[in-house]
């Protein structure tokens, strides 16, 4: 019921939709092999490849001062990605909630109503995880809770707060608590 109240709250729903509509992005640079005619900028590394690359084409008929040039050169390619630590954290939170609800469903002493609520919550979380921005996101290698975007950016801040409440509630125990119920 606690996770259900978090997931079904308007604040959490709005936060996930804000993240989906405006996720944290970053540029990643990789090396790609391009045909020599498609290279836009020649850096120092590309110039070295022109002199060393063994896969060459004869251009002696073009009077360029060179007899051969390479067919391809490796050049840096920048790509915009949403696979950031902040988005990995949001995915981790959603999957943690989903895992918790799945565990609740498997408990033998869980009542029918509790199992039904867990199933509804799993459906909502599955819907969130199916958003296009989360399909590119990998599993987190570490949790960076001190990220400025996670603490300040709208949407991320609310998800962090919900996860902290959930995590603290999961760790909460006291002696004699069983006697109360």
Question: Model-predicted segments: where are they?
Answer:
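A short, highly charged nucleic-acid-interacting micro-segment common to nuclease
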Residues: 177-181
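Terminal, charged accessory segments of proteins
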Residues: 1-173
